[in-house]
Amino acid sequence: MEPIGARLSLEAPGPAPFREAPPAEELPAPVVPCVQGGGDGGGASETPSPDAQLGDRPLSPKEEAAPQEQEELLECRRRCRARSFSLPADPILQAAKFLQQQQQQAVALGGEGAEDAQLGPGGCCAKCKKRVQFADTLGLSLASVKHFSEAEEPQVPPAVLSRLRSFPMRAEDLEQLGGLLAAAAVAAPLSAPPSRLRPLFQLPGPSAAAERLQRQRVCLERVQCSTASGAEVKGSGRVLSCPGPRAVTVRYTFTEWRSFLDVPAELQPEPLEPQQPEAPSGASEPGSGDAKKEPGAECFHFSLCLPPGLQPEDEEDADERGVAVHFAVCYRCAQGEYWDNNAGANYTLRYARPADAL
């Protein structure tokens, strides 16, 4: 009778029954050789385990595909684990979470068409693509203010400044420039000179001014329009000084006395002139007494400001528009009030073209 161990070792291995492969999580058990003694106790034999025998034979296609399916299933489970969002609810985060869930479902189903349907041509879902976000909803400021110091001057490179400098002109360039300017001056049409304020009165001479000063104690002697447009009128004259408070005022109008303005004049003492030596013959020259200034007289100066709209736009009908400025001089002192109004006609200035342009 043969020993049981020898009978097991000599038994021809037959085809093992089909069984499913162990799961991927479980590692295969190591092959342990089986050592059994013979009937006489002196012999020893190593018998491979059934798992080792299964490893020696070729696997069927179904058995080879089983471990691969297990690995794919585990990988899918890992991908399906959603990331936790600890931040507060936000539309952008919700949209990102929704997109991640759609991608995970598409991977789990293994369908590429589902992912294409959820994603637009730009790689984002239609819900995220049409969403508008404002800075205040994200906790940001709607406006940013930047302060600049006046002391911070920009550092301009010298190469940039060199481009702004004019190139040195040659003699030929200057000659050509002079010819071009002369041609332009000839080709330009001569425009009519602008109209100016012209006095419509005649100021008295020295003798008449002295006589008027003695008669009415105030006399206008000079009028001048300082600018071409006549926006300012300056004048001067003399008054007889008297004790007590005194003041000179110029009243003028440019609305034909529908309204008027009073401008105070500045009073100054009349400067003293050096006495001229007497003629050796003892006879005075004719008219020399007219130039003598009255003793105790004071000079006054005034300035009238006019609005800019008085000058006519059309130079041709400047004389017909009737734009005029009327004024008179008033002298107030302790003895009373005195006027110099051009013998009741007032001093009048009117816009007119120069005489040489007519």
Swiss-Prot record:
Region ranges (Disordered): 1-71, 270-295
Phosphoserine PTM positions: 86
Domain of life of the native organism: Eukaryota
Single GO MF descriptor: protein phosphatase 1 binding
Entry keyword Phosphoprotein: yes
Task of the protein: Glycogen-targeting subunit for protein phosphatase 1 (PP1). Involved in the regulation of hepatic glycogenesis in a manner coupled to the fasting-feeding cycle and distinct from other glycogen-targeting subunits.
Record field: compositional bias (Low complexity): 11-29, 270-280
InterPro entries: CBM21_dom, CBM21_dom_sf, PP1_regulatory_subunit_3
Protein name: Protein phosphatase 1 regulatory subunit 3G
Keywords: Phosphoprotein
